[in-house]
Amino acid sequence: MPGIDKIPSQIGMLMKSVLIVEDEILVAMDLERILEDAGYRVAAIVADQKEAMSTAGAVDMAFVDINLRDGATGPEIARDLAKRYGARIVYVTANPAQIGEPAENAVGCIRKPFNEAAILAAAALADPDQQDAIGHEDVIRL
């Protein structure tokens, strides 16, 4: 995709903090690697609602799975993070229909399985400082 190669260098200058809400550790570690390689600071990886609310703190954005260790709590976690901290939300799920009413600051959804370019495009979309964020066919804008 033209222009996709410039996303990491733009992101790298920003050092935004990210919370990863994902109960599949290999998926979470893949997200962490992609985001950290692009210059983001991953604040934490959490696997359920209790961990998310006790660990979250003020983060700039969150990548949130829908079905977690404690059930389909992702949408509620996303709403809480958006309301309490103003976090921009990117849902990461195999079934976007389960999102229901998106969180106030939800910007998009990425279908699993995902690729690195989709994650970087979604991160740029979730960053209010990215005026020229590049879209990606695997990112569903909300």
Predicted feature residues:
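Non-catalytic signal-transmission and effector/linker regions of two-component phosphorelay proteins
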Residues: 1-17, 111, 115-142
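Conserved acidic carboxylate
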Residues: 22, 93
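His-Asp phosphorelay/catalytic-motif detector in bacterial-type signaling
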Residues: 84-90
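As written
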Residues: 101-111
